Amino acid sequence: MELMLLFAKLPEAYSIFDPLVDVLPVIPVLFLALAFVWQASVGFR
Protein backbone atom coordinates (compact mmCIF):
# COMPACT_ATOMS: atom_id res chain seq x y z
CA MET A 1 0.00 0.00 0.00
CA GLU A 2 2.84 2.38 0.85
CA LEU A 3 4.43 1.61 -2.51
CA MET A 4 1.29 2.75 -4.34
CA LEU A 5 1.33 5.98 -2.31
CA LEU A 6 4.95 6.53 -3.32
CA PHE A 7 4.10 6.04 -7.01
CA ALA A 8 1.21 8.49 -6.66
CA LYS A 9 3.62 11.18 -5.42
CA LEU A 10 6.24 10.58 -8.15
CA PRO A 11 4.63 12.71 -10.92
CA GLU A 12 4.58 15.71 -8.58
CA ALA A 13 8.25 15.16 -7.77
CA TYR A 14 9.14 15.18 -11.47
CA SER A 15 6.95 18.18 -12.35
CA ILE A 16 10.07 20.41 -12.41
CA PHE A 17 11.29 18.38 -15.41
CA ASP A 18 8.15 19.11 -17.48
CA PRO A 19 9.80 21.89 -19.55
CA LEU A 20 12.73 19.55 -20.27
CA VAL A 21 10.38 16.78 -21.45
CA ASP A 22 8.66 19.28 -23.76
CA VAL A 23 12.02 20.11 -25.40
CA LEU A 24 13.38 16.55 -25.72
CA PRO A 25 11.51 15.56 -28.95
CA VAL A 26 13.13 18.53 -30.75
CA ILE A 27 16.70 17.24 -30.21
CA PRO A 28 16.77 14.74 -33.15
CA VAL A 29 15.61 17.55 -35.47
CA LEU A 30 18.52 19.68 -34.24
CA PHE A 31 20.93 16.83 -35.05
CA LEU A 32 19.45 16.60 -38.55
CA ALA A 33 19.92 20.35 -39.03
CA LEU A 34 23.48 20.08 -37.70
CA ALA A 35 24.27 17.29 -40.19
CA PHE A 36 22.90 19.42 -43.04
CA VAL A 37 24.95 22.47 -41.99
CA TRP A 38 28.05 20.28 -41.68
CA GLN A 39 27.55 18.84 -45.16
CA ALA A 40 26.97 22.32 -46.57
CA SER A 41 30.22 23.50 -45.00
CA VAL A 42 32.26 20.66 -46.56
CA GLY A 43 30.50 21.10 -49.91
CA PHE A 44 28.34 17.91 -49.94
CA ARG A 45 31.27 15.62 -50.68
Curated annotation (Swiss-Prot):
Topology with respect to the bilayer: Single-pass membrane protein
Subunit annotation: PSII is composed of 1 copy each of membrane proteins PsbA, PsbB, PsbC, PsbD, PsbE, PsbF, PsbH, PsbI, PsbJ, PsbK, PsbL, PsbM, PsbT, PsbX, PsbY, PsbZ, Psb30/Ycf12, peripheral proteins PsbO, CyanoQ (PsbQ), PsbU, PsbV and a large number of cofactors. It forms dimeric complexes.
Paired cysteines (S-S): none
Major place of residence: membrane
Membrane-spanning ranges: 24-44
Short name of any one Pfam family annotated for the protein: PsbK
SUPFAM superfamilies (UniProt xref): Photosystem II reaction center protein K, PsbK (SSF161037)
Full protein name: Photosystem II reaction center protein K
GO biological process, one term: photosynthesis
Subcellular location, record wording: Cellular thylakoid membrane
Task performed by this protein: One of the components of the core complex of photosystem II (PSII). PSII is a light-driven water:plastoquinone oxidoreductase that uses light energy to abstract electrons from H(2)O, generating O(2) and a proton gradient subsequently used for ATP formation. It consists of a core antenna complex that captures photons, and an electron transfer chain that converts photonic excitation into a charge separation.
NCBIfam families xrefs: PRK02553.1
HAMAP family membership: PSII_PsbK
Domain of life, per lineage: Bacteria
GO CC terms of this entry: photosystem II reaction center; plasma membrane-derived thylakoid membrane
Family: Belongs to the PsbK family.
Naturally occurring in which organism (per UniProt): Cyanothece sp. (strain PCC 7425 / ATCC 29141)
Signal peptide coordinates: none
Prosequence residues removed at maturation: 1-8
Keyword vocabulary terms for this entry: Membrane, Photosynthesis, Photosystem II, Reaction center, Thylakoid, Transmembrane, Transmembrane helix
